[in-house]
Amino acid sequence: MRPEIVLFGDSITAQSFRSGGWGSALADAYSRKADVVVRGYGGYNTRWALFLLHHIFPLGSSSPPVATTIFFGANDAALKGRTSDRQHVPVEEYTDNVRKIVQHLKKCSPTMLIVLITPPPIDEAGRQSYAESIYGEKAMKEPERTNETTGVYAQHCVALAEELGLRCVNLWSKMQETNDWQKKYLSDGLHLTPEGNGVVFDEVSRVFREAWLSPEEMPFDFPHHSHIDGKNPSKAFEERCL
């Protein structure tokens, strides 16, 4: 059985298997080495994600994931009193919720590679333009998310990773290192363009490799075709690669 890598998060994870998505790129990188499984839930915050843990990551599983990315925060950081008020989770609770997710995963497998990913930065003008394109004159004039507030959640995510000894992708900071990141990386001020997906893929791949999960060093699940003798193919299948 192939090892399993689970991508757990909100819509940015749910969309990661679209054309040009970071999840599909990971699946390609680990082709025939590991199964990349997307568990993304659009609109979810960490409070709601807790209800999914025992269903997605059952305790006592004989084959828990070898690695999991936890990518929440964009919805938790929605502002109270604005259009996405229902999704808001205070930053202290967000931090505690992520900690609970990590604790559950560690119970599933003490050796699991767990990677935290911060929410991406927010392009407030882009969010406003998107809202106006959907709601017209009824669009709320005040932003439902701000880059400053989202940055606070990102900082807490990074600090929690350091506290727990986990690896972390600080997407909020990384994307803002590039000029015109707002248009280059974000399609609607929040979700990712193909270029934005590329940043996530590069960073997650880097972290996986820095840990111990390099696809180049993993065996194929079954023999490579070049190892199969056309006259005696059964020999190559006497022992599975995994």
UniProtKB/Swiss-Prot annotation:
Offer a single GO CC term for the protein.
Answer: endoplasmic reticulum
GO BP terms = lipid catabolic process
Class of enzymatic activity (EC top level): hydrolase
Per the Swiss-Prot or TrEMBL record, the active site comprises 11
Q: What domain of life does the native source organism fall in? A: Eukaryota
Region span, Disordered: 223-242
Q: Which cysteines are joined by disulfide bonds?
A: none
One Gene Ontology term of the molecular function aspect: hydrolase activity, acting on ester bonds
Under Enzyme Commission nomenclature, its number is: 3.1.1.-
What keywords were assigned to this record?
Hydrolase, Lipid degradation, Lipid metabolism
**Signal peptide positions on this chain:** none
Q: Which family does it belong to?
A: Belongs to the 'GDSL' lipolytic enzyme family.
The record's listing under PANTHER family reads: GDSL-LIKE LIPASE_ACYLHYDROLASE FAMILY PROTEIN, EXPRESSED (PTHR14209:SF36), ISOAMYL ACETATE-HYDROLYZING ESTERASE 1 (PTHR14209)
Supply the name of the protein. GDSL esterase/lipase At5g62930
